[in-house]
């Protein structure tokens, strides 16, 4: 009888330890992780830092808020909200782009892109990331599910580590934390 009690205690103890120390199978909500609250919002990651400021996706292209471009990528862009124009000064002249247009002027020469350069939603101005990239030393890549854009603007050395085996990337350290990706 005492052996049977020890076996039951061993099984219960083993189940408890298994439950306590085995990894969680819970997947984290990536929209919550990136702070996405609306369908057209795009999370912005600059140099591996997730920003609170969000971008928007229009016609399949990412657009950044003017303030985000000015504060994090290139402070030489100027948005005139009274005239609804975007200005950018180069040594050879000033670029001027009107809201809702795919054309811009440089020294009275009209040029065009295959996308709208600047859009507005209420009082917020959004600049096409492709246009920002033309005049800023950045690279970017967009990702789906959830929508996000990763921008690299710092070209220094990046510290990396080699992974020894396949494992899940978790939200916080520890096996009980929800995983972000497998």
Positions of predicted regions on the chain:
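Primary recognition of N-terminal secretory signal peptides and signal-anchoring hydrophobic helices
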Residues: 1-179
């Amino acid at each position: 009888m005492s052996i049977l009690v020890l076996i039951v205690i061993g099984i219960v103890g083993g189940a408890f330890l298994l439950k306590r120390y085995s990894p969680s199978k819970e997947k984290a909500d990536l929209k919550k992780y990136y702070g996405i609250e609306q369908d057209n919002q795009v999370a912005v990651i600059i140099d591996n830092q997730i920003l609170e400021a969000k971008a928007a996706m229009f016609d399949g292209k990412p657009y950044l808020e003017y303030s985000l471009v000015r504060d994090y990528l290139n402070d030489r862009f100027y948005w005139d909200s009274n005239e609804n124009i975007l200005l950018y000064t180069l040594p050879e002249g000033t670029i001027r782009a009107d809201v809702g247009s795919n054309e811009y002027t440089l020294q009275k020469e009209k040029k065009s892109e295959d996308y709208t350069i600047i859009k507005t939603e209420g009082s917020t101005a959004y600049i096409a990331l492709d246009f920002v990239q033309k005049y800023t030393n950045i690279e970017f890549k967009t990702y789906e599910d959830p929508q996000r854009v990763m921008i690299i603007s710092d070209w220094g050395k990046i510290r990396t580590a080699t992974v020894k085996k396949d494992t899940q990337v978790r939200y916080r350290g520890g096996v009980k934390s929800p995983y972000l990706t497998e």
